Amino acid sequence: MLEKKQTKKIEEILTAIDLEQPAPSEEPMRQYYFMEKARRLVKAQSETVGRPLTFHVTTFGCQMNARDSEKLTGILEQIGYVEEEEENQADFVIYNTCTVRENANQKVYGHLGQLNRVKKKNPHMLIGLCGCMMQEPEVVEKLKKSYRFVDLIFGTHNIFKFAELVATRLESDRMVIDIWKDTDKIVEDLPSERKFSFKSGVNIMFG
């Protein structure tokens, strides 16, 4: 869980947001706007299925990916998802990918094949892919052609937009793809769930 002080601060920001107004252009307020929008959409879906929605994040690769996964987890918890230890039981599965080795890509494709079978039994399940593997154009093309059941694809440069991308997917019934080649934007001050209380990572580069 997020620290109480951080949770209280974020909650105050979210409850003050008026979704009847257009989304702000400035960050991080734009992402807080979409967090509140996603939170309401998740709540509605939870009420429909009669239980809290769950998520599972799998991290491949480096410490930077582990740090990014903490951010993804923090945002998911903030919008109403509950962490699930078993991947096949989760309503939202995210793979934070790495391309250090070629077999890393094949490992992700293998996992996706298994998830496709799970998703057929759980139609409202979402599958998201992010990380440096998604920065490869040929990978994205392969996913668009052969893995149409994937819901959300984004890269390393716009992970701060996660709440916005989730809200976009929850409002639609289509694959959402948002890949940036590079960026000069660094957006911090967003929810982050640290896996270990005694250590933390600091990004000194992105991408």
Predicted regions and their residues:
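Proteins enriched for Cys/Gly/acidic motifs involved in redox and nucleic-acid/cofactor modification
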Residues: 2-207
